[in-house]
Amino acid sequence: MKLDSIDSFVVGNPNPGIGGRYFIFIKLTTQCGISGYGEIYNASFGPHLVAAMAEEVFAQEMAGEDPFQIEKIWRRVYSRGFSQRPDITLMGVLSGLEIACWDIIGKATGQPVYNLLGGKLHHRLRSYSYLYPPEDAEAETFYADPDASAEIAARYIEEGFTAVKFDPAGAYTILDPHMPALEDI
């Protein structure tokens, strides 16, 4: 089995971009037609540039390789630069590519990926929701209003969630896209 192609998908998130401004997904396909999907995290650059980075890494380091050889691929990609210490964006790209390889391996062997990674640890997982403002609310005022937050938290409990996650400083995605200054927080 050999890796044959990569497709990338940049999915935007409507303003104010709560939960992230965009997501970058990739699809790797083998010569025998098995596809695996991965997500690239922690992109320091624009999403289309990061997707192009994934396509370049695939073309230079992974095309024609056996997806079962994750350690070999990982070490080669990790050691690409002269410093052999990649930046955080390349690590996000590598993570997405590795996830897609694990997906391919799981499909090829008929196993859930968790079995390949050591087995199931929990039979149930607690689900929580981030504390998002309602669609008709202004995000900046929502995060400053504890009563509005409590109302949404109660609604999530009614939906079956047993916990909510929130940032006491509010979501950074409601601010300008520059690095927030202390006064912004």
Where are these regions (language model features)?
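N-terminal amphipathic alpha-helix/helix-capping segment at the start of soluble metabolic enzymes
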Residues: M1-I6, K107, Q111-L125
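Structured beta-strand/loop patches that form or line metal/cofactor-binding pockets in enzymes
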Residues: M1-S44
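Short Gly/Pro-enriched turn/cap motifs at secondary-structure boundaries
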Residues: P14-I18, T89, E158
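Short coil/turn motifs at beta-sheet boundaries
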Residues: G19-R21, G92, K120
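Broad gene-expression machinery/nucleic-acid interaction feature
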Residues: F23-F25, G96, R126, A163
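Metal- or metallocofactor-binding catalytic centers and their adjacent structured scaffolds
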Residues: T29-T109
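Short alpha-helical segments and helix-capping/turn motifs at coil-helix boundaries
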Residues: A100, P112-V113, S149-I152
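Metal-dependent enolase-superfamily TIM-barrel catalytic cores that perform enediolate-based chemistry
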Residues: R124, S129-I185
